Amino acid sequence: MTADSKDTSMSEDNTETATAIENSSAMVTDVTSKSAPNVRLSPDALIKEFEASQQKSDLNDIYVGDTVRVGVRISEGNKERIQPYEGVVIAKRHGGIHETITVRRIFQGIGVERVFMLHSPQVASIKVERRGKVRRAKLFYLRERVGKATRVKQRFDR
């Protein structure tokens, strides 16, 4: 072998090694889908598939202005119980698995608001008690009102 042939063989080996390293790292980042074997998913598709598997499918349509009863799972020691929280939905945010609602109620004369992630495992159930008729997407003006002024008209068509 001449010096020139050694250089070309070494450069070919380096190229093959670099390709093998790139392929091995790509194999680590690419994850196959359970639903379709031997199909590689992009990271975005993988995230969407995971989120779809985590979403609750039994949720009713919830609108701003509705009075809802949310069953919240509470762990106390080794016991678990469901505590109801009832109030008016004053805001809806985000979408998909990140969807949240803000529920407001008056407790002992003080306004209390809680934000619930709809697809969270901590939310056991959501039941719409009453449909509300409103003309706003966010009902933050209810924070400044007191007594009967905080009531929302009932909607009968939904």
From Swiss-Prot:
Biological source species: Prochlorococcus marinus (strain MIT 9313)
Coiled coil: none
One Gene Ontology term from the biological process aspect of the record: translation
Purpose: This protein is located at the 30S-50S ribosomal subunit interface and may play a role in the structure and function of the aminoacyl-tRNA binding site.
HAMAP family xrefs: Ribosomal_bL19
Family: Belongs to the bacterial ribosomal protein bL19 family.
Single GO MF descriptor: structural constituent of ribosome
InterPro entries, alphabetized: Ribosomal_bL19, Ribosomal_bL19_CS, Ribosomal_bL19_sf, Translation_prot_SH3-like_sf
Higher taxonomy: Bacteria, Bacillati, Cyanobacteriota, Cyanophyceae, Synechococcales
Keywords from the named record: Ribonucleoprotein, Ribosomal protein
Listed Polar residues bias regions: 16-35
Keyword Signal assigned: no
Protein name as annotated: Large ribosomal subunit protein bL19
A GO-annotated cellular component: cytosolic large ribosomal subunit
Sequence segments annotated as region (Disordered): 1-35
Domain of life: Bacteria
Transmembrane region(s): none
